[in-house]
Amino acid sequence: MTVLSDMKCEACQADAPKVTDEELAELVRMIPDWSVQVRDGIMQLERVYKFKNFKLAMAFTNKLAELAEEEFHHPGIFTEWGKVTVTWWSHSIKGLHRNDFIMAAKTDQLLG
């Protein structure tokens, strides 16, 4: 079984395929703490991380920023006291690509 967090993102162009319904069902099982949201017709992955204070939430946000730069794939991040909401989707295809699931798994690893 492939471990998503061990995979690397690939360049995603505007003509890249979105995940199929079958792929979505398989991939979402690999990141059980994430939910699929649809905003403005665009499918996205979202998770809320809880922290004891703002400083810890900000430290996590900074780690996530470094990861996003390394993989050249960038999430929506909303940081507030004790909480960080992370949203992954592929802007170029206006939906979900395998990269988003890889990055969700890598984001989860930042907690460890």
Swiss-Prot record:
Transmembrane segments: none
GO biological process terms on file: tetrahydrobiopterin biosynthetic process
Gene Ontology molecular-function annotations: 4-alpha-hydroxytetrahydrobiopterin dehydratase activity
Catalytic activity, reaction form: (4aS,6R)-4a-hydroxy-L-erythro-5,6,7,8-tetrahydrobiopterin = (6R)-L-erythro-6,7-dihydrobiopterin + H2O
Enzyme kind, highest EC tier: lyase
Pfam families tied to this protein: Pterin_4a
Organism of derivation: Shewanella sp. (strain W3-18-1)
Family: Belongs to the pterin-4-alpha-carbinolamine dehydratase family.
The EC number(s) this enzyme carries: 4.2.1.96
Keywords of this entry: Lyase
Presence of the UniProt keyword Lyase in the record: yes
Upper classification of the organism: Bacteria, Pseudomonadati, Pseudomonadota, Gammaproteobacteria, Alteromonadales
Name the UniProt record assigns to this protein: Putative pterin-4-alpha-carbinolamine dehydratase
